[in-house]
Amino acid sequence: MLYTKKLNKKKLNTKEINIKTGKKFYSIRLHKINEEIKAKTVRLTGINGVQLGIVPIKEAIFKSLELEMDLVEISPNSNPPVCKIMNYGKFLYEKNKSNKEQKRKQKIINTKEIKFRPNTDTGDYKVKLRNLTRFLENGKKVKISLRFRGREMVHKKIGINMLNRICSDLKEISSIESFPNKIEGRQMTLILVPKK
């Protein structure tokens, strides 16, 4: 079926109507099709990818109409432009489907953050460590922030010892992505990644 068929004696080339809201919107197509192609001659490719040579645009449109397909301009910058006979609606559907599948296959890594203090008590430490192990086992990246307040800034070694303790407790299930060498602002950050 032709993509640019006349509907109620109007072409739906660029202006289309949203059925749910009834509002008009303008869709932008990446490819010119059928009568939109302004070149006088085109390099024509058939349905199965067979090269049909350089033909006048009228003949190319006639061949596409004969097969009840669309003539789609694939490469407008080449001389003469490359056009292919295909079902444009099906082409857009398959392209959209493959884009959705690629997005679905992408692995999204979420970063979870847990805040510590240099003098975090053992009970709080165990609870936070349990949360860290749960996040790492679920495949999430973990950011550990160690915040310093007031005179705690003088005791950097206590903070570094705390981060080393966290690393040693989680070494079976995680690996270190970045370990802080210095205090940035009033905090040190450690990033752990789950082992694969």
From Swiss-Prot:
User: Where primarily located?
Assistant: cytoplasm
Single GO cellular component annotation? membrane
InterPro entries registered for this protein in UniProt: T_IF-3_C_sf, T_IF-3_N_sf, Translation_initiation_fac3_CS, Translation_initiation_fac_3, Translation_initiation_fac_3_C, Translation_initiation_fac_3_N
Query: What Gene Ontology terms for biological process does this UniProt record contain?
Result: ribosome disassembly
Q: Which domain of life is it from?
A: Bacteria
Keywords, A to Z? Cytoplasm, Initiation factor, Protein biosynthesis
What PROSITE patterns does the annotation carry? IF3 (PS00938)
One short Pfam name that applies is IF3_N
Subcellular location(s) of the protein: Cytoplasm
GO MF annotations, alphabetized: ribosome binding; translation initiation factor activity
Q: Which family does it belong to?
A: Belongs to the IF-3 family.
Task of the protein? IF-3 binds to the 30S ribosomal subunit and shifts the equilibrium between 70S ribosomes and their 50S and 30S subunits in favor of the free subunits, thus enhancing the availability of 30S subunits on which protein synthesis initiation begins.
Quaternary structure note: Monomer.
What this protein is called in its record is: Translation initiation factor IF-3
Give the organism the record lists. Wigglesworthia glossinidia brevipalpis
Gene name for this UniProt entry? infC
